[in-house]
Structures are given as C-alpha cells and as structure tokens.
Amino acid sequence: DYAPDYLLCCNYICHLAVFKRALYEQLGGERPECDGSQDHDLFLRLIEQTGGAAHLPQVLYYWRVHAGSTSGGTDAKPYVAAAAKKALADHLSRTGRTGTVEDGLFPSTYRVKWDIEGDPKVSILIPNKDHTDDLEKCLYSIWSKTEWDNFEVIVIENNSTDPATFAYYETLPSRFADCRVVYYKGAFNFSAINNFGATFAEGEHLLLLNNDIEVLSFDFLRELLSYSQRPDVGAVGAKLYYPDDTIQHAGVLMGINGSAGHSHKSYPRTAVGDMYRLVTTQNYMAVTGACLMTKASLYRAFGGLDEEKFAVAYNDVDYCLKLWQKGLLNVYTPRAEAYHYESKSRGLDTLSENAKRYEREKANFYAKYQQYIDNYDPYYNPHFNNLFENFGLK
C-alpha cells in the first residue's frame, strides 16, 4: 500500500494509476520541467492534496519492457535522475520540509537526507549480562563510528555473575564519555529492563540497542535520528547483518509463519531486494528492538514495552504496532548498518529453557494481532509467500 518514504526513494507506483480529472486539471497536469519523471512528480503533487493513495493488491497490469524502457537498463534514459531529484526537491519545498535530495544506493533510486532541527540528545539503552567482549565491541563501535556527538549510553546491568564484569563496568566512565551503568535486580525480562533504563534517560530520543550489535556506518546515529525527529514517525530501524554478511533485519513483515518475520532475511549483504527494498528507505509495520530509535515522549506515552504479555519476544513489534495504529510511520533505513550477533547473551528461543515462554508470548501476540497476521500487512502483498520473508509469490 501507500508508503510515503518509499515513494521518496523511487517511483514504485510506476505507470498505472487512476485519479480524478478535476484534480489533475487543478494541478496543471504534468510539468514539462520534470519530463522523464513526470509521473513521479505528478504522484507527489496529487498525494499532497489527498494525503495518500489507495492500492488494489490484485494483479491487473503487465508492463512490456523494451530496450528503451527506463527499466531496460540504468542508462536507458539518463535524464530521468535529474528530473526525479527536481520533483523530490520541489515536493519538499511545497510541504515545508527541509532536506537534501541525493542519488540513492542504486541507480534510479534517491535519498532524502533530512535536516535535523536543533541538537537533540539520544539516550542509548543497552541491556547486559556478563559478555563484556560483546559489550566492548558494541561500545567501541558507537564511539568510533558516529558523527552525532550529543548522546549518552546507559548500560543496564541484569544479574551478571562474573566478577570481571563488574570490574569492567568500573572502567567505562573513564574510557567512554557520558557512559554509565544502572542496575536492574529482577529476573530477565527484556521489556522491564529497557523500561527501567528509560527512567534514567535524559535524551529526547531513545535508542534500544542489544549488546551484541556492532555499528558499521559512520552516520549511524544521525541517520536514525533524522527520521525519529519527524512528527509523523514512530520508530526507526536499521539494516542489520549476520556475521556472514547476510541480512538479519531490514524491516518486519506480519504474517510470516503465523507471527512475524524479517524482510529479506538471509539475503546477501550486496542484494538490492525486491524492487530495491533493501537499498531504499521503507515503511513497515514494525522494526526490530535489537536496534530501535523512538522519541522518548512516545515511549513514555505508550507505556514502553509490555512487561506482562511480551517479556522477551514480540515486545518490539507490539510497541511498533501500537504506534502504527495511531497513524505513525515506522521506518527502515538502509544507511544505518550494523552487525547483529543474534541473542548471544541469552541463547536462542528454540532452546528448551526458553521454548515454553516463547510459545506463550507467540500465542499472546497472535491473540492481539490476528487481523494483521492472517489477513493484512499493508507493506507485503497478499500474493507473496507467508512462509518465508523473500517476497516470493505463493
């Protein structure tokens, strides 16, 4: 369905669209100065008037591609990029938003680099139990690879048993500026731990971050923040890789295997994905809590993560869906990249000691969101397979 951030990266609507003649004439039709991307420009101007676009998920149209088509090769119409960037820049100007339109990560795609208003502070919340090697790698990557200086890190200690862990904590303030440790004494409950850490946060934005994350991109914090600051955005997620350079997370899809799954999971790092989805900003119903930025005001207003029904699993998706149900957008950006060493600190949910808890939380999730799991994810066509996250047809 309509995904506003995706439309700012490429004209995914393409050729077939229906709109009122009166509105078309009111807008003056197509603009010659955007020739080559005149349809993209028109869609942006139409949506400025209507607030969105309806979508029919049925297959009603086939595009016969020939050698001169835009899709026939990235050099088929070399003037298209300039026209598209003008259309996007004019759209930002008309809507009163500030940012720079740039070439995207792949030909025929684009990026809006949003200006950040003021100097907002980000509070990074990192739960930890022992595993100081992972935590050290995480912390070092944050300080060595960030172009945003106004942040604090709150390590949330939870029942470590190794004395070396506490000795390690003592070294943090002298090695990492504005880094402190707070102590959560209860049993492991990912939601409660993050909610506890958030009570100490001073920033206008919170970044929930697993201790097994290693930041890769230098504009990591700035990129996440540039979306989180927008009033229409609820949560922002990053592009996460497994250590073997395959995709771990690129947005969350509802309905995968009876619950939810990660878009393009296990695709190669270099893949562009279905219709450039891996290399363009996307709107999804949810993003993973392994790396999730949100406004502190929203986090508090929505009660943080659900400690009762989703102590460990699905709390991130539940939080995002609550935001989405209130009309906020959840965003995946491919320009905030990191490795995710997947749940090293507590073991995978398939292990016997976690299986019962996981199944209980999965049942809670299905009971609450059955309508989206069984019938409807606006960002995943119903003709796509719901057994895998690969955008393959059923």
Predicted regions and their residues:
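Acidic donor-binding segment of Leloir-type glycosyltransferases
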Residues: 143-183
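Conserved donor NDP-sugar-binding/catalytic core segment of glycosyltransferases
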Residues: 1, 213-259
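Short, well-formed alpha-helical segments that are part of the catalytic scaffolds
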Residues: 131-146
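A short, conserved alpha-helix in the catalytic core of glycosyltransferases
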Residues: 23, 33-59, 88, 220-224, ...
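C-terminal, non-catalytic tails of nucleotide-sugar-dependent glycosyltransferases
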Residues: 76-122, 234, 244, 256-284, ...
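Glycine-rich, basic loop-to-helix element that forms the pyrophosphate-binding segment
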Residues: 184-201
